Amino acid sequence: MMDDADVRRVAAEHLQRRGPGAVDWLLEQAKIAYAQGNADSAHTWREIAEAAVAILQLEI
């Protein structure tokens, strides 16, 4: 599992690369991981997506 600082860092990196569309991409990665039976990975992707949403809300 990633610590909170790493989750925020990765979320920020995805937002820089993909813009606000990163949230949808991150959620899609969570769905893919879950479909492949990897609940831990899916949880991590969802945490990163949630951090990306929080970052976007701070920018408003």
Model segments located where?
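Long, non-catalytic architectural segments outside compact domain cores
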Residues: M1-I32, Q36, D40-H43, E47, ...
